[in-house]
């Protein structure tokens, strides 16, 4: 991984600098003071955490416009304190972050066991460890935004259950 050697760390830093510069450019030329939703996946989750630590948390005028932040697809080790930018606790929360890294039900990566990693169940939008059973899964919207069934219903409802457990999202 990028954390195992100096060239990997350099590559990560170069990528992060591109992201920070692109975000600043967006704010200056395109945002026009509008609200912001941030989303990151996998390695991007690490970049977004760094953007929070090094830029966003130091800029209240920008931070207050961030409605939600999705730190998905990798462990979101808390890069900030709850007072700075909290983990969302229910579906109506704003100005907070959501995070999950999903695995097959029961699987725990050996290097992440017994850690305190923030996690949100994306079916219920709650992080209290309660399971979302198949009947609460509304369905899937495909990336082309097409509905298979008539009436704009989501496809394949009640197909997934999930539970947060020790920093993981277990899915079945």
Predicted features by range, described:
Residues 1-35, 172:
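Active-site catalytic motif of lipid deacylating hydrolases and related acyltransferases
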Residues 20-32, 54-171:
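Surface cap/lid and interfacial helix-loop subdomains adjacent to catalytic sites
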Residues 37-40, 69-70:
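Short glycine-rich or small-residue beta-strand-to-loop segments that form or flank ligand, phosphate
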Residues 39-48:
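Gly/Ala-rich beta-loop-alpha elbow adjacent to hydrolase catalytic centers
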Residues 49-53:
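Short, hydrophobic alpha-helix immediately C-terminal to the catalytic nucleophile
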């Amino acid at each position: 991984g990028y954390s195992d050697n100096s060239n990997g760390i350099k590559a990560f830093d170069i990528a992060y600098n591109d992201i920070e510069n692109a975000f600043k450019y967006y704010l200056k030329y395109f945002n026009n003071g509008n609200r912001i939703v941030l989303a990151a996946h996998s390695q991007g989750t690490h970049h977004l955490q760094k953007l929070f630590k090094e830029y966003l948390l130091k800029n209240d005028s920008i931070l207050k416009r961030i409605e939600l932040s999705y730190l998905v697809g990798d462990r979101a080790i808390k890069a900030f304190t709850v007072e700075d930018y909290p983990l969302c606790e229910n579906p109506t929360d704003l100005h907070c972050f959501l995070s999950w890294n999903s695995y097959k039900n029961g699987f725990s990566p050996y290097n992440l066991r017994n850690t305190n990693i923030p996690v949100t169940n994306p079916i219920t939008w709650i992080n209290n460890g309660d399971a979302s059973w198949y009947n609460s899964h509304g369905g899937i919207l495909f990336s082309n935004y097409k509905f298979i069934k008539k009436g704009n219903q989501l496809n394949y409802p009640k197909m997934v259950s999930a539970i947060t457990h020790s920093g993981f999202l277990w899915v079945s």
